[in-house]
């Protein structure tokens, strides 16, 4: 829903700044001041910070964001194993976030490395992107997308108050109506995502 909130600010002509960082990078990696933001982007890399992508997917141009700067931590306190895990051999910090740069050098966060699902033909599928689309539906409050037996399954919390308000005259039939509502949601989502990111099942969560 972050992109929706950002679009709202743009439509309202409300000035805003944006930034991206982690505690370990103390804290900013990239950012943009009002007037220089770009929808969906965290902005360019900050002065004094170096960032690059590792293990880039040749199809999408996406890769893990790794950074180096004077403000990046030198390690976790008394935990050399964890420290070793988050640094590359040449000393860059692994954010475990996936992203890409556009031609202007603006950074776009695509998802978490640990959450990424690999499609049947090697596609990178980001549950967060699909969840954003699902959550933009007016009957949805929250969702989680996961992979089960090679299919993408959406676990969805519906807005029960809105459902009952909309279908008040047939409240007793709402249970039967849910199959149609879930099918409509699936069509809505699949019309807005890549072919390999289409969901196959919607499961209502209560």
Predicted feature residues:
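Gly/Ser/Thr-rich phosphate-binding loop
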Residues: 1-37, 50, 141
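Ser/Thr-glycine-rich phosphate-binding loops at phosphate-binding pockets of nucleotides
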Residues: 21-25, 95, 120
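Conserved ATP-binding/catalytic segment of the ANL
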Residues: 45, 59-119, 136
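Residue-level signal for inorganic ion chemistry
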Residues: 51, 105, 134, 154
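A structural signal for short hydrophobic beta-strand segments in well-ordered beta-sheet cores
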Residues: 51-53, 97-101, 145
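Adenylate-forming
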Residues: 72, 106-135, 162-177, 195-200
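Conserved C-terminal "lid"/linker of ANL adenylate-forming enzymes
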Residues: 117, 142-150, 184-206
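Short acidic amphipathic segments
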Residues: 134-143
